[in-house]
């Protein structure tokens, strides 16, 4: 176990950021269900940051790839407008049932969430161009390029994209690493970098967040 004295300043900062965020009982219950399902919920600090992005982006229409058990959705909804709608996509029906339970426990009106079951590669093309304020991708790193390529057209001018898992477990910065997850996160970063409409930043929370705003 690493002691506080052995941690780098960056590790200490991240630990402090995570410890500074508290979650209510509803989010905590959703987190517990996510762990039971193996859904890999976002950390509290990542959730809080998603709430901030939802608010800053306008928060009227948000699309999420990777519903999980609803932890990230609860955080996103907390930052969205009262009339904002979260569209969230997941291939696992059990995940979406758990998320629906979380939204109900949080007394979120059914009209504010649209849960779509299916593969994101098939769902995203059915959504309208330039109709969303924020795109959140929380999925397997190897799939990030496909989801980003299919979702980037959904963003209105001034919108933003946030990709969770952008560090691939810390391996993305290792020049010798070339497994599918590392290749995926690097390709997603390249797509953003090559698109002149976006300004991007890598944030060292959770498993790394790649965030970018569209001009």
Curated annotation (Swiss-Prot):
Organism name: Mycobacteroides abscessus (strain ATCC 19977 / DSM 44196 / CCUG 20993 / CIP 104536 / JCM 13569 / NCTC 13031 / TMC 1543 / L948) (Mycobacterium abscessus)
Keyword Transferase set for record: yes
Lineage: Bacteria, Bacillati, Actinomycetota, Actinomycetes, Mycobacteriales
GO MF, one example: S-adenosylmethionine-dependent methyltransferase activity
Family indicated by similarity: Belongs to the class I-like SAM-binding methyltransferase superfamily. Cation-dependent O-methyltransferase family.
Protein name per its UniProtKB record: Putative O-methyltransferase MAB_1361c
Any single biological process term in GO: methylation
CDD domains according to UniProt: AdoMet_MTases
Residues that, per the record, bind substrate: 138
Leading EC class: transferase
Binding of S-adenosyl-L-methionine, residues: 42, 64, 66-67, 72, 90-91
Keyword Coiled coil: no
Keyword line: Methyltransferase, S-adenosyl-L-methionine, Transferase
Entry EC no(s): 2.1.1.-
One Pfam family linked to the record: Methyltransf_3
